[in-house]
């Protein structure tokens, strides 16, 4: 029993330490409740009294405007990564944050330009907002399906009211609003093909509880490119990749949270209701008859599909269209059958699939691991298979979308071949 007696002081100390920690947390929460007082603030917009909004203090300017029915685009979900939620404050401008300093010039900062996702509403302000943002609206969609199309990518299909279609253009995006929620990743198996289970099990991704029940209304939203084209309405489609924590010894780091928006989307089931707002976008098709090359990787498949199907099936274009799509293996490839069918039907459409890490099962099916145009990083395969053979690469349009490394590699490659930045349309949500 002596060894039990020796543990008694340790037990008492540990208990006291935990109790003290809980007490400090309670004090902090109570202090916030009673010391940080919420008060009404007026946001006067474009010097128009009829547009003045009264909001509670404490939230970001981005969230406050969204609560008031003005959806400023923020593709990165308010993380100051995409730098698209720019807004000009003309009265009562606070000191710029570091995120503002890295975004705007000194002159712009003096003029009151700020990132609305980082600016807290603490007092009355006068704002200048582009009129196009007043045309953005919200829609409620119903989940039709939410199946995995790759190990970590889902195709979310929503149906919206056909009497109120969304006026989007190919290359555009919508913001998905995330309510408070709680989910267990094991429940996601309901909308996942069993072929993807093994990778999730290898990285211990199942049976993880993700709890965001404390989310404020409209505090979380993220933009996703549309994979559908207008003729598919009232259905709209997205390709969405799950944002997992970084891995440590083949397990997600428990100290890093899962993506708030992507986890919510992965938890959706047929029949669920989803709120989207928009439409937004700048990466539309340039109507100048130049041939177009799409350089797409991963979940960038949304961006490519929307443009390509609209050009071929709705606009019946005669422009030469080439798609280079990069995936790790055939299991990760998206829309292959659809593109192969289009290639047979339209002589002006050319489809190239490039695998960076083909599986043994891919090789067993006849995939050529020795061909550098089929098995390679996409930017290298594209250079070997097409770019180096073009007499005038600058005469083409290049539409680029994919992971950050994919995008940067393509941009560097095109720059090396003398392609002007104005001929490159990059769909990049701050990745």
From Swiss-Prot:
Query: Which Gene Ontology terms of cellular component type are present?
Result: plasma membrane
Quaternary data: Composed of six subunits; NqrA, NqrB, NqrC, NqrD, NqrE and NqrF.
Main location group: membrane
Transmembrane keyword on record: yes
One family name in Pfam for this protein = NAD_binding_1
Q: What is this protein called?
A: Na(+)-translocating NADH-quinone reductase subunit F
The cross-references to HAMAP family, in alphabetical order and at most eight, read: NqrF
Which catalytic reaction applies to this protein? a ubiquinone + n Na(+)(in) + NADH + H(+) = a ubiquinol + n Na(+)(out) + NAD(+)
Looking at the record, the residues that make up the 2Fe-2S ferredoxin-type domain are: 41-133
Q: Where in the cell is it found?
A: Cell inner membrane
Positions of [2Fe-2S] cluster binding: 76, 82, 85, 117
Q: Which GO terms describe its biological process?
A: sodium ion transport
Specify where the region named Catalytic lies, as residue ranges.
Answer: 289-413
Key word Membrane present in the record?
yes
Q: Which organism is it from?
A: Chlamydia muridarum (strain MoPn / Nigg)
SUPFAM superfamilies according to UniProt: 2Fe-2S ferredoxin-like (SSF54292), Ferredoxin reductase-like, C-terminal NADP-linked domain (SSF52343), Riboflavin synthase domain-like (SSF63380)
* Keywords (A to Z) from UniProt: 2Fe-2S, Cell inner membrane, Cell membrane, FAD, Flavoprotein, Ion transport, Iron, Iron-sulfur, Membrane, Metal-binding, NAD, Sodium, Sodium transport, Translocase, Transmembrane, Transmembrane helix, Transport, Ubiquinone
Q: What InterPro entries does the annotation carry?
A: 2Fe-2S_ferredoxin-like_sf, 2Fe-2S_ferredoxin-type, Beta-grasp_dom_sf, FAD-bd_FR_type, FNR_nucleotide-bd, NqrF, OxRdtase_FAD/NAD-bd, Riboflavin_synthase-like_b-brl
Which residues belong to any copy of the FAD-binding FR-type domain?
Answer: 136-286
